[in-house]
Amino acid sequence: MTKVKYNPSWSLNAFLLLEAQGSIDKPPDFPEYDSTKDWCGPEDNERLASMIPDAIMGVPVSIAGYRHDLGYATPRAMRPKWARAQYVWRLLCDQRFRKDLMTLLDRVKLSKDDMKMAKRFAKLYYWSVRVGGSKHCVK
C-alpha cells in the first residue's frame, strides 16, 4: 500500500480514515490523535452544532476540526516552524478558517437572525480555542 504524505489541510474525517488504513506517511515523532485532548468540532458538540444555521453547514470545519496540544501551546512566532515540520496545529482563530466562514456567509442568503447566529458561532469558535478547546467538547 502506498503512503500519502501528511497534509495539514485534511479534514478530521479524512485524517482518521487514512490513519485507520495506515496510509499516512508521518514525520518522526508525529503526535497521535487523542480524542480526550484534541479539539472536537460541531459534530461532537451539540451546543456548537445548534448554533450553525442549516444554510452554512457546508463551512469547511476541517480547517478547524483537529488541533493538537503541541500546536495549541505553540507561541505565534513558532507556529510557522511547526507547520514546516508538518505537525498538527489547527487553531480556530486561524485567519483561513475565519475567511472561509465569512466567504461562505457572503454566498448564502440568511435572515438577519440567522446571520447574527452564524457570526456568533464564529466568535464562539474563535474564543473556544483561546480559552481552551477541549473543555468545550461533549465527552
Question: What are these regions, as identified by a protein language model?
Answer:
Residues 1-139:
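Extended terminal accessory/targeting regions
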